[in-house]
């Protein structure tokens, strides 16, 4: 399946506690259709110290994945979410925004 969102894309969160926030996609998990977005869905985890591994304990902030359907690609020029369309250019498949036909880098 071809995803319209890829790593390093600028996305906006559509639903949930972080609705309206914009971030960059760090990683995509294709097996369960989730993405990790930088600075979004941050939780605090209480970590026990492990002396054998020289790992200190404490409270760690961690980014958890969110479902890919809850994010949309963000168009900087229009400052809103947008749809993606694929097209062929010089024998290569490219992506662009549907509203203003601008290429997605």
UniProtKB/Swiss-Prot annotation:
<dbReference type="InterPro" id="IPR041988">
    <property type="entry name" value="Ribosomal_uL24_KOW"/>
</dbReference>
<dbReference type="InterPro" id="IPR003256">
    <property type="entry name" value="Ribosomal_uL24"/>
</dbReference>
<keyword id="KW-0689">Ribosomal protein</keyword>
<dbReference type="GO" id="GO:0006412">
    <property type="term" value="P:translation"/>
</dbReference>
<dbReference type="GO" id="GO:1990904">
    <property type="term" value="C:ribonucleoprotein complex"/>
</dbReference>
<dbReference type="GO" id="GO:0003735">
    <property type="term" value="F:structural constituent of ribosome"/>
</dbReference>
<dbReference type="InterPro" id="IPR005825">
    <property type="entry name" value="Ribosomal_uL24_CS"/>
</dbReference>
<keyword id="KW-0694">RNA-binding</keyword>
<comment type="similarity">
    <text>Belongs to the universal ribosomal protein uL24 family.</text>
</comment>
<dbReference type="GO" id="GO:0019843">
    <property type="term" value="F:rRNA binding"/>
</dbReference>
<comment type="function">
    <text>One of the proteins that surrounds the polypeptide exit tunnel on the outside of the subunit.</text>
</comment>
<dbReference type="Pfam" id="PF00467">
    <property type="entry name" value="KOW"/>
</dbReference>
<dbReference type="GO" id="GO:0005840">
    <property type="term" value="C:ribosome"/>
</dbReference>
<dbReference type="Pfam" id="PF17136">
    <property type="entry name" value="ribosomal_L24"/>
</dbReference>
<keyword id="KW-0687">Ribonucleoprotein</keyword>
<dbReference type="InterPro" id="IPR014722">
    <property type="entry name" value="Rib_uL2_dom2"/>
</dbReference>
<comment type="function">
    <text>One of two assembly initiator proteins, it binds directly to the 5'-end of the 23S rRNA, where it nucleates assembly of the 50S subunit.</text>
</comment>
<protein>
    <recommendedName>
        <fullName>Large ribosomal subunit protein uL24</fullName>
    </recommendedName>
</protein>
<dbReference type="InterPro" id="IPR008991">
    <property type="entry name" value="Translation_prot_SH3-like_sf"/>
</dbReference>
<comment type="subunit">
    <text>Part of the 50S ribosomal subunit.</text>
</comment>
<dbReference type="InterPro" id="IPR005824">
    <property type="entry name" value="KOW"/>
</dbReference>
<keyword id="KW-0699">rRNA-binding</keyword>
């Amino acid at each position: 399946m071809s995803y319209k969102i890829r790593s390093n894309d600028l996305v906006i969160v559509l639903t949930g506690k972080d609705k309206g926030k914009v971030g960059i996609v760090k990683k995509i998990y294709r097996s369960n259709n989730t993405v990790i977005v930088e600075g979004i869905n941050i939780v605090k985890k209480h970590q026990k110290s492990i002396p054998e591994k020289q790992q200190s304990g404490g409270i760690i902030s961690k980014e958890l994945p969110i479902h890919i359907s809850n994010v949309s690609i963000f168009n900087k020029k229009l400052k809103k979410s947008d749809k993606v369309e694929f097209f062929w250019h010089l024998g290569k498949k490219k992506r662009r925004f549907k509203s203003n036909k601008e290429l997605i880098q």
